[in-house]
Amino acid sequence: SSDLHASIRPVLLTGKEKESAPESFETIKALGKDFKGYYFRIQVNTLDCQGCGNCADICPAKKPALIMRPIATQNETQVPNYNYSLKFSYRGDLTNRFSVKGSQFYQPLLEFSGACAGCGETGYAKLLTQLFGERMVIGNATGCSSIWGGSAPSFPYCTNQDGHGPTWANSLFEDSAEFTYGMFLGHNQQRQRVVELMTRDRKSVV
């Protein structure tokens, strides 16, 4: 799933969870040794889909797995289905995070931005958050990505269940490389200071 705006989610269910699902919540047996005993579904959040059609155009399945339909024909079934899928945690720990398939089972920490429908930037940013999101530090250059990425009061970068997520800042001046390098140096300085304090005080800790 390209999941450009995080409105498409891969879902893994146990047999018991599948039995409790709405009747329209169709699943198939999940493929791969990592997912033995699980059932798989791609769930669309119709209320946040922007209707660009990119996902349907590039879906790699031999038989089209994503088909565009008028939203009015989908909300009645897909909204309850999406809400049901939210009851279960992401199951990325079952597989290799740093693979195309495995990365998609990690929570995207970029959700429902105000970017234009079909934006080519958000898919990459969303994938980065699935790979490194809980420890990402972003120094955003000024441009489209700073508008959809940080226009008050909307902020699409979010946190996981532990409260961890990307740190984001933007410099209006055309110095994003220097600006972000300064963030890197400051981070290293803080870490070094912690090491110095711990080293100095370790003998006094009972």
Provide a role label for each language-model segment.
Residues 54, 126-131, 193-196:
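Alpha-helical scaffold segments in soluble metabolic enzymes
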Residues 37-44, 104-115, 175-180:
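Glycine- and acidic
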Residues 110-142, 146-153:
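N-terminal amphipathic, basic-rich helices that act as targeting or association modules
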Residues 5-41, 47, 61-101:
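Non-heme iron-sulfur electron-transfer modules
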Residues 173-206:
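N-terminal leader/propeptide and maturation segments of large enzyme subunits in energy/redox metabolism
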Residues 12, 63, 69-78, 147-178:
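Catalytic or ion-translocation cores adjacent to nucleophile or general acid/base/metal-coordination motifs
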